[in-house]
């Protein structure tokens, strides 16, 4: 029995390496498989790692808008005592504090991030205001008024050893984890920025289902055994009877 030759399409789950942009991984996949119709279900900043849901072929790229609305889960590290303009480790340092919060203070502040909260998007973000992305204003040295957005979060403290505060958070679409780190710093009175971020889950897809993103730069790497359907099941080749 032979296997039918079909167009390459499906969901490819990739563990994005640190230092890579999401779009550089898409370009690597385009070069590897020769398919230009590739989308995703949510980008990650260059310093972040973890689950990237890559959608291959027209049938699956059409699912992008649906998958973007699904909940996500992250592990993160907030660095206390220092503030940056971008709220993360890639930004310019704009403040320092010598205050060392107590565990009691940390527990009280982290307990706030449960259920629905109001969050303001950071200036260094792709959120559009008056037709321009916020980071375009920020790069011009401008800070403009931004509207609050209601997001849903479930934050769990993992470990606190000053200056690092480790936590895991499940959240709804549109949640900025670096804004959570920044707000934690404000609440604790010492400032903070997001030092590490790893996406553990995106919708039904988890990190243990992902392939190493570095494989996409290996000539001849076979993606077929790793393609999944929209429910996360491995796709099986269609036999020719």
Curated annotation (Swiss-Prot):
Cross-referenced InterPro entries: PsdUridine_synth_cat_dom_sf (IPR020103), PsdUridine_synth_N (IPR002501), tRNA_psdUridine_synth_TruB (IPR014780), TruB_C (IPR032819)
Catalytic activity: uridine(55) in tRNA = pseudouridine(55) in tRNA
A single MF term (Gene Ontology): tRNA pseudouridine(55) synthase activity
EC number(s) reported in the record: 5.4.99.25
Extent of the signal sequence: none
UniProt entry keywords in alphabetical sequence: Isomerase, tRNA processing
Annotated GO biological process: mRNA pseudouridine synthesis; tRNA pseudouridine synthesis
Active site as annotated: 45
Keyword Isomerase among UniProt keywords: yes
KW Protease (keyword) present: no
PANTHER family: PSEUDOURIDYLATE SYNTHASE TRUB1, TRNA-PSEUDOURIDINE SYNTHASE
Function: Responsible for synthesis of pseudouridine from uracil-55 in the psi GC loop of transfer RNAs.
Family affiliation: Belongs to the pseudouridine synthase TruB family. Type 1 subfamily.
Name of the protein described by the UniProt record: tRNA pseudouridine synthase B
Organism: Chlamydia muridarum (strain MoPn / Nigg)
Lineage of the organism: Bacteria, Pseudomonadati, Chlamydiota, Chlamydiia, Chlamydiales
Gene that this sequence comes from: truB
């Amino acid at each position: 029995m032979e296997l039918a030759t079909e167009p390459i399409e499906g969901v490819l789950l990739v563990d994005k390496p640190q230092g890579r942009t999401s779009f550089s991984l898409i370009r690597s996949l385009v070069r590897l498989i020769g398919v230009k119709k590739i989308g995703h279900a949510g980008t990650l900043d260059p310093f972040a790692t973890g689950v990237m849901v890559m959608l291959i072929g027209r049938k699956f790229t059409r699912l992008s808008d649906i998958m973007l609305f699904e909940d996500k889960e992250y592990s993160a590290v907030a660095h206390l005592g220092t503030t940056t303009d971008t709220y993360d480790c890639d930004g310019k340092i704009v403040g320092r504090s010598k205050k060392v919060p107590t565990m009691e203070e940390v527990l009280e502040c982290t307990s706030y991030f449960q259920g629905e909260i109001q969050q303001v998007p950071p200036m260094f973000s792709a959120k559009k205001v008056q037709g321009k992305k916020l980071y375009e204003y920020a790069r011009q040295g401008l800070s403009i008024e931004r509207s609050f957005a209601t997001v849903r979060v479930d934050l769990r403290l993992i470990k606190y050893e000053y200056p690092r505060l480790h936590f895991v958070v499940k959240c709804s679409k549109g949640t900025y984890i670096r804004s959570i780190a920044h707000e934690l710093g404000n609440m604790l009175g010492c400032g903070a920025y997001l030092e590490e971020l790893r996406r553990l889950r995106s919708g039904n897809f988890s990190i243990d289902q992902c392939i190493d993103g570095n494989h996409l730069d290996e000539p001849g790497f076979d993606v077929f055994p790793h393609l999944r359907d929209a429910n996360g099941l491995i796709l099986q080749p269609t036999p020719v009877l």
